[in-house]
A protein has these predicted regions:
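Phosphate-binding beta-loop-alpha motif at adenosine-nucleotide cofactor sites
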Residues: 135-151
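ATP-dependent small-molecule kinase phosphotransfer cores
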Residues: 32-91
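Short, well-ordered beta-strand core segments
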Residues: 76, 97-100, 139-141
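Short glycine-rich anion-binding loops that position phosphate/pyrophosphate groups of nucleotides
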Residues: 81-85, 104-106, 146
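Short, charged, surface-exposed secondary-structure boundary motifs
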Residues: 43-45, 107-113, 151-152
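Pre-Walker A (Motif I) flank of P-loop NTPase domains
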Residues: 3-8, 74
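A glycine- and Lys/Arg-enriched "phosphate-lid" helix/loop adjacent to the NTP-binding pocket
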Residues: 95-135
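Glycine-rich phosphate-binding P-loop
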Residues: 8-26
Length: 160
């Protein structure tokens, strides 16, 4: 089994918020920050061209290699889009301590930070995604999309 000390994957329902939160958490805890989506996009520069030339199956194999390579990182806080997390959840569970920063629907609707594009989730999709994350993460932390300091404090309080 992989040593998961100081290896955290941050997930949530609002990708832009999770990206910013992860960067802040990494800085605040003196850990390396990695956006998994950016790593995939950087590693596979011309995604559509690769798919057109080699097919979706080949692209998925390349993407899976990148996900597997995350095991080599240490002292890291990474973030990932919900859709990618769903696809590689089992593999990621063996690599990271996975933390779900839960935002309730009311908090999303009251979002004061315009820079976080709150996804237009209907109630059914919100409930399904929330349930999936709660069932597939090591820890769930309630958070406030409008209070980053509170979220950083909640993360510091967890013990693995």
């Amino acid at each position: 089994m992989q040593n998961k000390d100081n290896k955290f994957l941050i997930v949530g329902l609002v990708d832009d918020f999770i990206d910013q939160l992860s960067a802040d958490l990494a800085y605040d805890n003196n850990l390396y920050y990695l956006n998994v989506e950016n790593l995939i996009n950087y590693s596979i520069l011309e995604k559509q061209k690769l798919i057109d030339t080699c097919g979706v199956e080949y692209f998925k194999k390349q993407e899976e290699k990148i996900i597997s390579s995350l095991k080599d990182y240490e002292n890291i806080i990474a973030c990932i889009k919900y859709s990618t997390f769903v696809e590689y959840c089992d593999k990621l569970r063996g690599i990271f301590n996975i933390v779900y920063f839960e935002i309730d629907e009311k908090n999303i609707k009251e979002n004061k930070r315009n820079k976080f594009a709150t996804e237009n989730l209907n109630r059914i999709a919100f409930a399904e995604r929330d349930k999936f994350l709660k069932n597939n993460c090591d820890i769930t932390l309630k958070c406030d999309i409008n209070n980053m300091k509170q979220n950083l404090k909640a993360f510091k309080a967890i013990q693995f």
